[in-house]
Amino acid sequence: MEGSSSGRLRDLPSVDAVLKAPAALAMLERFGRAASTDAVRAALADARAAIAGGASHAPDAAVLARAAEASLEADELSNMRPLFNLTGTVLHTNLGRAVLAEAAIEAAVAAMRDPVALEFDLETGKRGERDDHVRALLCELTGAEDATLVNNNAAAVLLCLNTLAAGREAIVSRGELIEIGGAFRMPDIMARAGAKLVEVGTTNRTHLKDYRVALSAQTGVILKVHTSNYRIEGFTAEVGAAELAALAGQANVPLMNDLGSGTLIDLSRYGLQREPTVREAVREGSGLVTFSGDKLLGGPQAGFIVGARALIEAVNRNPMKRALRVDKIRLAAIEATLKLYRDPDRLAERLPTLRLLARPLAEIEAQARRLLPAAAVAVEPAYQVALRLCRSQVGSGALPLDTIESAGLIIRPTNGSRSLERLAGALRALARPIIGRIEDGGLLLDLRCLTDEAGFLSSLSALDADALA
């Protein structure tokens, strides 16, 4: 047996022989000699390992060339390739949150393709500020005196706290000490900002007198945090921003209001739960308001800071600001997204996030009925497909108690022993993956976010029958 194994190893062609095989021509043309050589070496290493493990024959040059090419093709697929988000979570943190509007995509591409006046004043010919591209827009849409932005909302909170309360005290209700995604907690961010946390009230009830008692000569800021990713219900009490602003004004201490997801419009007009708007927070007297760009606003990831001019100027003087600034590509997309809000009557048509959230149940249910026959053919006979009414959610910590009527396709095994995890894995392995959620003994594909029916059916039809067996 040992001699036979050695013989099979000797039968393996050399790297050069594989590269000279006709089957390698297309690979060399497509991927180049260096990458092809490395792939052939890897294919030969796999073949040697297989022979050592008992494989009965040595693959020839053509087989090895095809194996090398297949590995290069697999490597060429981007890990961030497009997929179908059928999880029912519109703003899925792990799937990139907001899908950008076409106007934002076009603006970003233009900024990538050519030089742009990022920090250049076209009127004076002198150096400008990158914030100028969105400052006036943010002030117009929020009613604030001034505005700036950084690369995400956690950075906005960090920067503001460091500016207002480094080495000083920051007063916040215990019920607002939130934890956001990735186990990042507000107390940790405050500590990194150099602020000393002063908790007031209790988890479920905080009163104005709690803040008043906590005020001291060391107070740098009063912080209000909108608990956008959870709700405390029942025997509760909290102090509104307007009351806190009045108290802060009396004490000559700034009020900072972190809205988290943030929204520029009244969402109730689209059938969603009402959230406090940024304009309302500004009007209530918050000195600084922070909010996200890639959640309810429907744009790229960003952290917006709006409020009193003197406070914004202080934020902009903080050296930390430069480390957190946004690049030209994102800034171009942000500007284009914000401009869409100037026309609220057509916003749902142009902003994908809002369009998907406001999509009527009847439309989604009709789509499910259209897709069901072809979907059933793609997974039969191992699985069966049925129409299923379900509930979608906003996601990314926004409107945690607000679910939306939706419809989808639920795929269940015809044989109870078949694995739903295996089916989910097969869908993830597609060239354009399909991501659903497992519930109620099946894999549910919530169709709220499906806009490309033909592409979905094409991906589904590419399922490997062996993977489903």
Curated annotation (Swiss-Prot):
It is found in: Cytoplasm. Converts seryl-tRNA(Sec) to selenocysteinyl-tRNA(Sec) required for selenoprotein biosynthesis. Its EC number is 2.9.1.1. GO terms for molecular function: L-seryl-tRNA(Sec) selenium transferase activity. This is L-seryl-tRNA(Sec) selenium transferase. It is an enzyme of class 2 (transferase). The keyword tRNA-binding does not apply. Pathway: Aminoacyl-tRNA biosynthesis; selenocysteinyl-tRNA(Sec) biosynthesis; selenocysteinyl-tRNA(Sec) from L-seryl-tRNA(Sec) (bacterial route): step 1/1. NCBIfam families: selA (TIGR00474). It catalyses: L-seryl-tRNA(Sec) + selenophosphate + H(+) = L-selenocysteinyl-tRNA(Sec) + phosphate. Its cofactor is pyridoxal 5'-phosphate. GO terms for cellular component: cytoplasm. The modification N6-(pyridoxal phosphate)lysine is found at residue 295. It comes from the Bacteria. Keywords: Cytoplasm, Protein biosynthesis, Pyridoxal phosphate, Selenium, Transferase. Belongs to the SelA family. One of its GO terms (biological process) is selenocysteine incorporation.
